[in-house]
Swiss-Prot record:
GO BP terms: actin cytoskeleton organization; adherens junction organization; anterior neural tube closure; cell division; cell migration; negative regulation of actin filament depolymerization; negative regulation of microtubule depolymerization; neural crest cell delamination
Stored InterPro entries: CH_dom, CH_dom_sf, F-actin_Monoox_Mical
Similarity field: Belongs to the cytospin-A family.
Organism: Canis lupus familiaris (Dog)
Residue ranges constituting the Calponin-homology (CH) domain according to the UniProt record: 1011-1116
This protein's record includes keyword Cytoplasm: yes
Xref: Gene3D superfamilies: Calponin-like domain
This protein's name: Cytospin-A
GO molecular function: beta-catenin binding
Amino acid sequence: MKKASRSVGSVPKVSGISKTQTVEKTKPENSSSASTGGKVIKTGTTASLSKTKSSDDLLAGMAGGVTVTNGVKGKKSTCPSTGSSASAPAMTTVENKSKISTGTSSSTKRSTSIGNKESSSTRERLRERTRLNQSKKLPSAGQGANDVALAKRSRSRTTTECDVRMSKSKSDNQISDKAALEAKVKDLLTLAKTKDVEILHLRNELRDMRAQLGINEDHSEGDEKSEKEAIIAHQPTDVESTLLQLQEQNTAIREELNQLKNENRMLKDRLNALGFSLEQRLDNSEKLFGYQSLSPEITPGNQSDGGGTLTSSVEGSAPGSVEDLLSQDENTLMDHQHSNSMDNLDSECSEVYQPLTSSDDALDAPSSSESEGIPSIERSRKGSSGNASEVSVACLTERIHQMEENQHSTSEELQATLQELADLQQITQELNSENERLGEEKVILMESLCQQSDKLEHFSRQIEYFRSLLDEHHISYVIDEDVKSGRYMELEQRYMDLAENARFEREQLLGVQQHLSNTLKMAEQDNKEAQEMIGALKERNHHMERIIESEQKGKAALAATLEEYKATVASDQIEMNRLKAQLENEKQKVAELYSIHNSGDKSDIQDLLESVRLDKEKAETLASSLQEDLAHTRNDANRLQDTIAKVEDEYRAFQEEAKKQIEELNMTLEKLRSELEEKETERSDMKETIFELEDEVEQHRAVKLHDNLIISDLENTVKKLQDQKHDMEREIKTLHRRLREESAEWRQFQADLQTAVVIANDIKSEAQEEIGDLKRRLHEAQEKNEKLTKELEEIKSRKQEEERGRVYNYMNAVERDLAALRQGMGLSRRSSTSSEPTPTVKTLIKSFDSASQVPNPTAAAIPRTPLSPSPMKTPPAAAVSPMQRHSISGPISTSKPLTALSDKRPNYGEIPVQEHLLRTSSTSRPASLPRVPAMESAKTISVSRRSSEEMKRDISAPEGASPASLMAMGTTSPQLSLSSSPTASVTPTTRSRIREERKDPLSALAREYGGSKRNALLKWCQKKTEGYQNIDITNFSSSWNDGLAFCALLHTYLPAHIPYQELNSQDKRRNFTLAFQAAESVGIKSTLDINEMVRTERPDWQSVMLYVTAIYKYFET
């Protein structure tokens, strides 16, 4: 049964060759192979069952069914029968007849494939060679060996063709989402065929499982012979009886299907109890066809079996399927071996192309090694075969693990991409609403600007009036209206240009948005039309199926009527024969009566004759009536035959029409697929347009923020003019009061400065203690190397001269700054309070540090604003161990008093030497300060107060300035303070980007690395953990299941908390505990459960990605 199904299943469907011809060709081939090899197999009628398989099942049959010529070997195969072996012959016959009628559509559909034609030509050449070999009928083993070698060469060619077909099927699977519509139509067309295919699969798999588990292996050839005889006896003579038997067998087939499913589940549970799993599949073609170069040899075997034994130089080294591994394990216990290398290849090929349609199909991977039942080989090779099988199991496990990882990574990336697409759609909607809101705000701002311009004109008239009053009273004032009017005109012109550009860009954006919305509506309409077309096609298909069912029912009714008429004709024939016999008897009686008449009384004889004549007339009338009834019955039978012929012609025409409709459906499907590809391209174009719109919206926001700044400047100017009108008479009193307050603040500032000097003295004393320790170390180093001491003395002398010059220059700069501060603490306090906080001891020390680093161009202070990004990330306080804190606190703490005390003590001769010693000691032990450069660079990033001090010096007036000039100063100072504010140097684009990064920290990472946010975060993790051992981050699930990835990622920031060299991948709980504790020590809350992470091999990738995002947000943003 197994061999017959595989041999015909491997033959592809070719146009122009009918099903019945294929079946007729298969029957003599199988019968001749059975007579030559001395083994009995079932007839080829069961082979037509495999013709209704789908494309994947056809490939599976091709991979496993090339062994059709193995019947020439003459080996006896024990085919264990299923539980329902009694009803199997009749059922097989019924299935063969049904497959002849139901497989025509699939054969016509697949006839266009070039690969199938090549496989068909190869199959025909193989069949012709097999016929020639069978016609010779040579009983010798040498001739059988030549036939087997020829079959093996044909098998290698067919296996190559299988490789080509497998690559094509893989390329089709890559566009599975585009072929979803085609799959639906195909499922509807093959709905009536899948049940029979599943029955055949379950039968074959049940035999394979029983062969593996050693159940019912002692079946004789008598069963096969009896099944064959039953098949021949039960073959129907006409189509009508076949249809009747099909209807009768339908319920039996369903019951057997349920029984086979139950047995299949039972065997599956039994295998799971033994510790094996059949759900792992081989999806890699390299594993399958890597052993095609094996050269099998034919060794003559026992002549009583009529064949030979197949051996190979690398017996058992090829990787087998899971079923082969199970069979090898069972056969090792039973001292038998049922497989070899080429059969393993067959079973693997059939497994690779086997589709998994349901949970019960997990066992549906036919293996030819168990079905063929190859005899056992020498015991000396069992050890090497066992070792090779262990190596094969290890390779299979590794490859399966790799394929599972790739599959999970791909699904994870697809889920992340879909989620980001949904986020982008939401962002697009938000941007559209924001754009509309900005348009409304722009209208409101334009109205407000018009109102402010009206107020400005009104205030300008009032100012002219007040100036005329000042001129009448001979009060002097500063005339700067020309400069102001020019600046106002320039600002107004710029604002009008910006407003015009904004309106033009908004119109463009609205046009693009309308175009995109129209395109989206058209795409939705096309999709709706495609769905409607698919629904219509489905309805049409259902209608055709209903018509076919009604025709079949009508045909069955006609067949039943014909049977009734035939039975009536037969009964009439029997009655007519009986009457003929009765007539002969009556004639004999008449003859006897004539003889009696001649010898006896005539009157009595005449009465008898009269009665006999009456009976004769009655019999003749009855015979004539029966003949007329017979003629009518024959006419009715002829009419019914004509009706049946017409119905068959109509059925053939309907089949041709159905084929045409299927071709039209395929063409429609191709059109839908092309339209779907066009929709995909349009979707990608829409995505690109969305990205462009996002950039334009960001630019629009930047322009809007800039416009807001200009408008705020104009509003501030208007407010200042209004305040100037009201405060002009009270300005002098206010200034006197402020002078008194600022003098008090200046005294407080001097007291704070004295406190800072005291603190600096304390720091200096600590630094001197550290310097003493460093001097002792330097003395020890000088004793070790005298040559270096001389060089150090030379360097020391040069450094002393340089440091003295720096200290003197610094003292001069400090004195100038202090003088400027004393002079500028007057009116400049008003402007400085609006833009800067009150100076404290910390800010003074930082300003002195930044001033002391000005002569060194590499350590120049970088002014930083609250919103500007930091030039270098510094680790938090928890990232430094206590030993590192102690070693870092020396150079950092001792560098401050060198500059903080320079204004009070300008004649320190030892300061350059000590500073030089500190630098020398810091360079002599770089291993103890692995992260000191980052801390020192962080020290240089301080807020510089030089710009504000220069501004104060510029706007400060002499102490004896006139009140009018002070009032003029008051009008200009707010403008200067606005331009010197910390947020003035940040552009609107930078502000919006910083807000976006704070809201979504992965957006900047996605812009940096490109692609999706998930891939960008994955690349960042790979870059951060580069160089760490046992770390391979490919996804956010299985790559993090041992905790080493978390430890490596946090070790880059917190090396004191994680001893990475002491960790291993086996102690998962310790790894996760260290990583989560280190993250919690700096404020990163743990969102993962340690027990769940330790227990599961593949944690939830979204939870892991969320936690890694929190780590990135804390340390990198």
